[in-house]
């Protein structure tokens, strides 16, 4: 059974006009390695920590500024939201299609809230806490190409022609602001698009981005802004002591106009200085140590890296299943070809290397979780190949071969072919990232014994489900298994309304 909304009635939850206040018993374990009777042994001790959560229920008017607004992802997301807001339908060769938000965790997935008369009851994910309605989001942003969004949509060739014709009047007047362009960080083949760039030193470029954010906020009368990078994949930046290893050194490097400070890092600096959440949707190391240092000291949300939309999402599910079933993956070979501008940019070795790192690390935590299967330091052979094939456009082909060892020396091979409509998969993920980033800025918590409420750590692990290479605070374990990431996100939001984590025990029927 499906219900549209619900309210929790519990002595641990209080609803007021301004907030939802919950008291939550967090049950976890601590491990102790101790000597007993002359030998060391591991002892697992269950413990309960009481937490309080406070969620501001005022839903702000949200502005979203995309870096790379005129790219395939930016034009697809903007057009998709307009189509939903306006209730647009269009003819395909199969049927009359209605606009929807399929592919969005917040808008098109459900959570289990309990059972009634022997039937499980589900509610929309977005009903857990008050969230921004995507139809109300105001879009803007930057792009090194000055093409308006209607023409960018046509260039992308993602939407059906009938839909493009209906969207064009809404999008013709949308023109990206000039963007930061540094040819050293992206493929040379992007130079022909760069007709809309911010001039000046790196310090002047940061100042211009700050000015742009303030003017966008004022012009559109939005309460909050979230900025997200959906522009070209950059090459990795060199992390050097004295250059970008601390906040102070990063600022000094900007003042010296050091060449190794990337455009994405400049956007992130501007956002942090404005206390605007910044999310990196590409695989490069935007968040150099000095930038993370700055975000922590300013307590400004940052998240990333790289949208998890197609092949990698499948991989984080399949390898988790195999290792969890006691099957040993020994070889993972992933081949991709695509024909959009992302593929064109990734044809350069230095930008491909960023993507290769992002895609290759996704199985690490699953492998390290099972020392029965893997010796210390042992790891599956893992190869990632990406090729640019212009004809296929945005329809990325992903082919994977998984070879595993099974019972008594046997071998098992799984081969997958996945046609990933790149931007149609990425656009709802971008939407989820900005909506959840905004929501998380309205949540405060404190553990028993802490005097004051505080926000989540600025490095937003809560967004991990949506990214290939989750950014985590220093010293925090990286979790890539998709089911664990979704459970973490859902259970944190459940805690905010005093609901227990979904453990699937269903003891009442045992």
From Swiss-Prot:
EC number, UniProt record: 5.5.1.4
Q: What does the record give as the reaction this protein catalyses?
A: D-glucose 6-phosphate = 1D-myo-inositol 3-phosphate
Q: Where in the cell is it found?
A: Cytoplasm, Cytosol; Nucleus
Q: What is its main location?
A: cytoplasm
Instruction: Give the first-level EC class, as a single word.
Output: isomerase
Cofactor dependency: NAD(+)
Q: Name one Pfam family in it.
A: Inos-1-P_synth
A Gene Ontology term for the protein's cellular component = nucleus
GO biological process assignments: inositol biosynthetic process; phospholipid biosynthetic process
Q: What is this protein called?
A: Inositol-3-phosphate synthase
Q: Whose protein is this, by species? A: Nicotiana tabacum (Common tobacco)
Upper taxonomic lineage: Eukaryota, Viridiplantae, Streptophyta, Embryophyta, Tracheophyta
């Amino acid at each position: 059974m499906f219900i549209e909304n619900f309210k929790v009635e519990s002595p641990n939850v209080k609803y007021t006009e301004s907030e939802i206040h919950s008291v939550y018993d967090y049950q976890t374990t601590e491990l102790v390695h101790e000597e007993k009777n002359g030998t060391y042994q591991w002892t697992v001790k269950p413990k309960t920590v009481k937490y309080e959560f406070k969620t501001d229920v005022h839903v702000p008017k949200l502005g979203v500024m995309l870096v790379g607004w005129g790219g395939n992802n930016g034009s697809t997301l903007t057009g998709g939201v307009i189509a939903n807001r306006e209730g647009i339908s269009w003819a395909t060769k199969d049927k009359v299609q209605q606009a929807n938000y399929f592919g969005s965790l917040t808008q098109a997935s459900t959570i289990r809230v309990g059972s009634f008369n022997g039937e499980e009851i589900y509610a929309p994910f977005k009903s857990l806490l008050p969230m921004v309605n995507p139809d109300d989001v105001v879009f803007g942003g930057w792009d090194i190409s000055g093409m308006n969004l209607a023409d960018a949509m046509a260039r992308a060739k993602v939407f059906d022609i009938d839909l493009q014709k209906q969207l064009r009047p809404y999008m013709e007047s949308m023109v990206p602001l000039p963007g930061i362009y540094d040819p050293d960080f992206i493929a040379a083949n992007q130079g022909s698009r760069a007709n809309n760039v911010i001039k000046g030193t790196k310090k002047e470029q940061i100042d211009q981005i700050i000015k742009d954010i303030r003017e966008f906020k004022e012009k559109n009368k939005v309460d909050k802004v979230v900025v997200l990078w959906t522009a070209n994949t950059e090459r990795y930046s060199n992390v050097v002591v004295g250059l970008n290893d601390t906040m102070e050194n990063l600022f000094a490097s900007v003042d010296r106009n050091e060449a190794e400070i990337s455009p994405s890092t400049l956007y992130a600096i501007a956002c942090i200085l404005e206390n605007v959440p910044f999310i990196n949707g590409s695989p490069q190391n935007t968040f150099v140590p000095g930038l993370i240092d700055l975000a922590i000291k300013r307590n400004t949300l940052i998240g990333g890296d790289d949208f998890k939309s197609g092949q990698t999402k499948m991989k984080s599910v399949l390898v988790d299943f195999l290792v969890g079933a006691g099957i040993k993956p020994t070889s993972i070979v992933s081949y991709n070809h695509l024909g959009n501008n992302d593929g064109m940019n990734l044809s350069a070795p230095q930008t491909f290397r960023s993507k290769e790192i992002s895609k290759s690390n996704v199985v690490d935590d699953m492998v390290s979780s099972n020392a029965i299967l893997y010796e210390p330091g042992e790891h599956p052979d893992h190869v990632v190949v990406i090729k640019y094939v212009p004809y296929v456009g945005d329809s990325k082909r992903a082919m994977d071969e998984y070879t595993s060892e099974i019972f008594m020396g046997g071998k098992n091979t799984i081969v997958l072919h996945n046609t990933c409509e790149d931007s149609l998969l990425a656009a709802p993920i971008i939407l989820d990232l900005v909506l959840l980033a905004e929501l998380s800025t309205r949540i405060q918590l404190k553990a028993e014994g802490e005097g004051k409420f505080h926000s989540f750590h600025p490095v937003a692990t809560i967004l991990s489900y949506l990214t290939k290479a989750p950014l985590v605070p220093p010293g925090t374990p990286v979790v890539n298994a998709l089911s664990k990431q979704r459970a973490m996100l859902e259970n944190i939001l459940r805690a905010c309304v005093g609901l227990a984590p979904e453990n699937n025990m269903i003891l009442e029927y045992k």
